[in-house]
Amino acid sequence: MAITPLTHLPEQDVIVVGAGFGGCAALHHLRRAGYSAKILDACDDFGGVWNMNRYPGARVDSETPTYQFSDTQVRDGFNFSENYPSSGEMRRYFAHMSAELGLRRDALFGQKVVEARYDDESRRWVLSTEKGLVARSRFVVFAAGSSNKAYIPDFKNKSAFKGPIIHPKFWPENADMTGKRVGIIGQGSSGLQIVQELAKTDCELTSKNPSGRRAT
């Protein structure tokens, strides 16, 4: 028997957009306060930026004593292996945290919100997703963060480059740079983390900073 796609979510007190740290914390505390709430997230699981970013060397730049939930049941049940965990370990942490707090039952993944409007007549928010889901709520918490969109500069003559152009957000799984000439443009956190990892491989590596400022 065919499964009918969900097109209308039962009305909630609150819809939370985003399943990273902010969204997970919002859902947990809203439910604890007695509100009905659901998370909508464009990705396939919890984690936010740590679910999206899987490039070589991706890791936290804040130490774990401060970069985690303070809830005892979450904190005491997970031991980080490093002070600055990798993105892979952060995904394992989010799996642990979401299981401990029972968040998955109120989360809908693969639901990219494309419209949020307030209906004055019903005094409700109406959210629509790319897949056609419609959700209504009294309140909305926007917790999508600021790093969910890839910035790809329109460099002059970029189309003339015949090799692959890879943004860290879309790094291919198991990509092998051995024996290749690799140029890294940008020396922020992502750029430097990738450089540190690729420097361990047998490739010709060049790092450029278009801004001319020192690495950050």
How would you describe each model-predicted region?
Residues 52, 76, 81, 102, ...:
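A short alpha-helix-loop-beta-strand transition element characteristic
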Residues 31, 51, 99:
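Short polybasic/polar patches that bind polyanions
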Residues 35, 51-93, 212-216:
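Glycine-rich active-site loop/strand segments that organize a redox cofactor
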